[in-house]
């Protein structure tokens, strides 16, 4: 007896994909040549184990097509390697990285936090945001030291406030400011903070320092503890972050530099680089999603191995999934490349799986090379969808009748994932 395979179980000869602004040539596991479309304004999540060519085969080429197709788009690149810099870096582009010797001087982004604060719409909010990132890791493990760390954070904000309010003509470089603070005694820091009346209540509350009776102030153990935690954060300023420069994200957004901005993440200096990278990436995201930004140039964020900022059990939440879910209407597009869905948990506060799973809704375009872990395969099967499939069950006896069972199954099976090239 001959049993034909139902039409519902036969695969289409070619995938039905929408047309994009360009395409990338690729080959399916069965040898079929296809054109993978590159869509403007659509976020893309690319997954696959190490060495499958995620960056070289798709992400780089997709970024090139999108940037070439619209000269107004600004590019933001994050990478641990140097693939994007080798291909897209031109004369006036800027590179934010720890090691100043690794980048040509004309391309090095040397930040100036005082100038950045002055250019913000709300300087007070900008100071708090910068301090939040710099003190985040201390506060996460604060326990009984939280009060002293919070006081050190308030002190750091007070120093920035004094410079911005009392010395309006000065954009003190990071190097000059940090080295001066490291040399100052506790008494000198308190006297400096007292120059700004807006700091007086903070001095009294956190330090027990009354500016009207400054000569009667006696240093307590609490004062030295606050100074200790402040110094810990000051030690984070090194490399290019402790140089005297004039560069700001505001100036790049305003078109004063080149078209592209590169975040070159150095794993050897991860503890120092992480808070600054998170601060600047969040600043770009907030600018694009702000209702006060008006009409501005679209931004393409090309993020390769962004989850490497979470190595060592640290989270790296700067609002990626908020940007993915809301950025389309504001002209923000994201190309995200990673090895595993599980790695993305670190991009949410406290490794929150629910935020990450919900954030995947912001990536309607999925490109899968060979996945290497069950969590990623299961997630992709869910995202690609399921359908009813017919199974013919042959009888054990030749006298029996075959039966047809209809079951809900993923459109992409584990066998098909395994057939992808390693």
Residues covered by each model-derived region:
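P-loop NTPase motor domains
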Residues: 2-31, 36-40, 44-332, 378, ...
